[in-house]
């Protein structure tokens, strides 16, 4: 997500 700069693709984020 844009808020968590470590994870640009929200699909990759849990």
From Swiss-Prot:
GO molecular function, one term: toxin activity
Main location: secreted
Origin: domain of life: Eukaryota
Tissue specificity as recorded in UniProt: Expressed by the venom gland.
PTM per Swiss-Prot/TrEMBL: Contains 4 disulfide bonds.
UniProt keywords, alphabetically: Disulfide bond, Ion channel impairing toxin, Neurotoxin, Potassium channel impairing toxin, Secreted, Toxin
Keyword Disulfide bond: yes
Gene Ontology annotations for the cellular component aspect, listed alphabetically: extracellular region
Subcellular location: Secreted
Function, in words: Blocker of potassium channels (Kv).
Similarity section: Belongs to the short scorpion toxin superfamily. Potassium channel inhibitor family.
Entry protein name: Leiurutoxin-3
Gene source species: Leiurus quinquestriatus quinquestriatus
